[in-house]
Amino acid sequence: MKKIFTLITAVAMGVAALSSCCNKQEESKAKYIFLFIGDGMGASHIAVTESYLSAKAGKIGGEQLTMTQFPIYGTSTTHCENKTITCSAASGTAIASGHKTYYSRLGCDKDFNPLKSMAFPLKEEGYKIGIMSSVPITHATPAAFYASTPDRGDGYGIMMQIPDSGFD
C-alpha cells in the first residue's frame, strides 16, 4: 500500500471532538465505534469515482460520495519508520496503535516490542470488538488490530493470535 487514506478515522476523531465540545448537557458513552479503512485508497480514487457518478447522472461535476459530505473530512498519507513508501503492515500498525514502525513489521515497534492496538483498551472498557475485512483476516491491515510479529508474512503466527485477542 503506497498511501493510506484514513478519511473515516479523521472523521470519527473530528466528530468525537466536536461532540465533546458542544452541548455538554448530557454525556453518554458511544454505543458503537466504527473505523473504516480504505486500504490503498487515495484522493484520486475518490475524484474518479465522483466524476464517474456525475457522468452517469448526466452532469458535469457535482456528484459526491457520502463520505465526502461528512461535516468533518480529512485525509492523510503516511510513510513508515524506515522507508518513504509504506506497506499495509507498517501503516496498519500506525493506524491501530498510533506508533510508526519499520516496513513489514506488524504490531511491533522497530525494536520488535509489541504494540497494542486501540481495540484492546476499548475491549477492556466493555466494547465488543469485531474486525471485518474484504481480505483474509490474517492480512496486514486487519491483523494490525490484534497481532504482533516482525514478519507480516507469518500468516500462521498471525492466525494463532486471533483467539488470544479475546475479540468478539
Feature map (PLM): residue ranges:
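Positively charged n-region of N-terminal signal peptides that target proteins for export
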Residues: 1-4
